[in-house]
C-alpha cells in the first residue's frame, strides 16, 4: 500500500512547484532531470500546465515556415492571425484585471518591472484577460486561422504552426497541445527562472526575454501578449509577430 501511494504522488505531485516530465508522463523533481525528459511542468494553485520543451528548435516550426521568404526571424515570429477580424468563439477583453489596460506581473525574484502592479495572488484574477484560462478552447479557433489577414504575409500564423507541430513527432505523442491563454502565460512568466532552469536541465530551449503570444483576444485588431523581459501584459496588433510556446493541461 505504501508503494502504491508513493507511485500516485510521483505520477501527479500535489505540491506547488516546477517539475520535469519523463517520457512515460511522470512528473519528477528537477534533481532527477536528464535530457531524456520530454517537457517541464508547473503546478500552482490548482493549475497544472505542461510546457513544451524546444519551441523553434523543433523541426515542425521550420516545416511550417518553409514556404515563406527568407528572414532572420521567420521560424520564431508568428502572427496571431486575421488582422481586422473578431474571432467568434474567443472572448474579447479590454482590461488586464477589470481596471487597467495593461499591467506588470511580479517576477519570481519578488520585484515588479513597472506599474501598475498585477496581484501575485492568481485566485484574485477574476476579471479582465487574466481571468482567461481557456487556452485550449481559444486554440481550437486559432487552429483554423492560417492567414495574417489582408496583405500581412511575412509570418506564419500561430495556429498553422500548432497544426504542423501536432502532426509531427515533436508533439511526443500528445494531440492536445495548445497556445496558452493570457492567464496561463502569465503564470509561466511568474515562475520563469524555475521554468528556464528546468528546461536547461533537460537540454531544452529556454524561454527568451521577448514578446510571447497568448490565445486571448482584445478586439478585431489586437490580441494579448506577455513581454518576458519585464512581465508587462498588454495588447499587440495582430499584424505584428511574436514568439509562441505551446502548453498542455495535466489532468
What do these predicted ranges mean?
Residues 155, 164, 174-175, 182-251:
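C-terminal, surface-exposed recognition/capping segments
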Amino acid at each position: 500500500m505504501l508503494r502504491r501511494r508513493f507511485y500516485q504522488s510521483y505520477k501527479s505531485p500535489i505540491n506547488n512547484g516546477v517539475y520535469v516530465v519523463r517520457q512515460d508522463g511522470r512528473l519528477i523533481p528537477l534533481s532527477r532531470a536528464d535530457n531524456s525528459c520530454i517537457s517541464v511542468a508547473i503546478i500552482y494553485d490548482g493549475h497544472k500546465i505542461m510546457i513544451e520543451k524546444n519551441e523553434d528548435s523543433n523541426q515542425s516550426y521550420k516545416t511550417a515556415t518553409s514556404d515563406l521568404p527568407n528572414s532572420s526571424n521567420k521560424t520564431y515570429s508568428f502572427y496571431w492571425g486575421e488582422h481586422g477580424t473578431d474571432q467568434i468563439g474567443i472572448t474579447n477583453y479590454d482590461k488586464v484585471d477589470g481596471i487597467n489596460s495593461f499591467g506588470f506581473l511580479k517576477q519570481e525574484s519578488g520585484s515588479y518591472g513597472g506599474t501598475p502592479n498585477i496581484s501575485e495572488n492568481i485566485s484574485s484574477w477574476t476579471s479582465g484577460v487574466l481571468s482567461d484560462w481557456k487556452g485550449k478552447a481559444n486554440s481550437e479557433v486559432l487552429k483554423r486561422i492560417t492567414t495574417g489577414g489582408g496583405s500581412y504575409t511575412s509570418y506564419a500564423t500561430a495556429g498553422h504552426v500548432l497544426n504542423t507541430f501536432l502532426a509531427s513527432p515533436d508533439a511526443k505523442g500528445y494531440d492536445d497541445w495548445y497556445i496558452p491563454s493570457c492567464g496561463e502565460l502569465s503564470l509561466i512568466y511568474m515562475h520563469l527562472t524555475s521554468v528556464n532552469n528546468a528546461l536547461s536541465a533537460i537540454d531544452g530551449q529556454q524561454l527568451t526575454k521577448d514578446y510571447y503570444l497568448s490565445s486571448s483576444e482584445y478586439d478585431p485588431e489586437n490580441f494579448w501578449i506577455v513581454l518576458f523581459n519585464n512581465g508587462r501584459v498588454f495588447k499587440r496588433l495582430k499584424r505584428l509577430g511574436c514568439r509562441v510556446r505551446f502548453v498542455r493541461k495535466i489532468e
